[in-house]
Amino acid sequence: MPRMSFSQNLYDLLDMKVMNKVIDSCAFLDFCAVDSPNQVSDGDAIGRFRNILIENGLQEKCDKDTHSVKKGNQRIDIMPDCIIIGGGAAGLMAAVTAADCGKSVIIFEKNQRVGKKLLITGKGRCNVTNNCTREEFFENIPTNSRFLYSAYSGYDCEDVMSFFECLDVPLKTERGNRVFPVSDRAEDIVIAFERAIKYRSELITVKNAKVTKILTEDNAVTGVVADGIAYHAPSVLIACGGRSYPKTGSDGDGFRFAKELGHKVTPLRPSLVPLVSEEDWCRDAMGLSLKNVTLTLKDNESGKVLYSELGEMLFTHFGISGPLVLSASGHIPKMQRDRYSVHIDLKPALDEKTLDTRLQRDFADNSNRDFINSLGKLLPAKLIPVIVKLSGIDGGKKVNQISRKERITLMQLLKDLTVTVKDFRPIDEAIVTGGGVCISEINPKTMESKLIKGLYFAGEVIDADAYTGGFNLQIAFSTGHAAGMAM
């Protein structure tokens, strides 16, 4: 059956009267205007488009799995080269890349708008990548970094930055080489992708559409079923995310699809997620954000330090959160209650001897004050009652009555405030999902399945995740680009 592109021959096929009906119904695609958004409003739109064709004698019948138009004695297939499941970071990058390679593409997106998870990343600012060296990038990927060598080589942080700047999104680099839009608006990143879709006539988005099955024949992809209708294509990309933030559409469908097609999925776990503490005192400091502290994660069973970094963290009603905690959580391979502990150095710029000297000076300046009222220059107000309680020193005790032993205990507490890790917070609160489709079954150069011809994976569905700082979005963009080039 001859294939035509979405817009290539429809002017010849349809007269303007029929074209106007298509456009007015918002069906399938705004074929006629380069300045009109080529996005379908919902999964029923293709059906409405086909009904218009039937009404105008352009299609003999409307079988659920038939998507072609008839001109004279010739039936012309209007199905795409590629179907992409999921309009997130990886899916969008793959779609734009494939379209630029001359492929016709349909994105099936569950939500009313693409990029829903992008809108909330980086606290609504969208940390699009990390402007670091190649070596630094892979140092920040604790899970299966070698698998990403080829994809990152083909599309690195500089490529991502150039992509958005070419779409009129100026970027800036902040502390830790984190790259954000100058506007600090994640919305601008999503708008940039929408703009990229808009001006690529071979790329359309079907929104509010739920894919329920991937079709195969003889170990090769033939299409998908979405909202009860079969759509055919020789290439299908699973880019529907993990299981974190399910309200954005990432509810684990990609893992189910992979398993149904014979792929192994490694155990899923929350990654980059807040931690629940055994200690109740964290609740007393709830809402307190600490800057310039050193957080160290230890494995109490082996005695090994798994992670140590200077930065920011936050106390919550359940335990601890913030950038340092999220990154530390990625170093916990499997949660075991009380096996891991977090050690907070509240004064990393001072060694123990220097800090003790500082305490002696502060105590001398406040010799007649109650202990609890002497720490204002040393600690945030919300943390003082916690430290006093943990030190074992009576808060009403006069400073000039505090013994050397008590002072040393206080000093050691300030250098090693310990939180015992009870558990991860639920996976739907995680920034990313750890685990995923087994990398041994994916071609690292193309992201194509080694089991099913024409099946591809990109983004969070793959068993590869990184620390905070823009690294996970870079993985999504790199793997999405690799898939888009190969589809």
Where are these regions (language model features)?
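Active-site- or DNA-interface-adjacent structural scaffold in DNA-acting proteins
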Residues: 35-77
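Short hydrophobic core segments
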Residues: 83-85, 108, 211, 224, ...
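A glycine-rich dinucleotide-binding beta-alpha-beta segment and adjacent secondary-structure elements
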Residues: 207-209, 385-465
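Glycine-rich FAD pyrophosphate-binding loop
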Residues: 83, 99-123
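Glycine-rich active-site loop/strand segments that organize a redox cofactor
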Residues: 125-173
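An anion/pyrophosphate-binding glycine-rich loop and adjacent beta-alpha core
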Residues: 112-114, 119-120, 134-135, 264-269, ...
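Beta1/beta-strand and adjacent pyrophosphate-binding region of the FAD-binding site
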Residues: 78-90
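A conserved short coil-to-beta-strand element within the FAD-binding core of flavoproteins
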Residues: 207-220
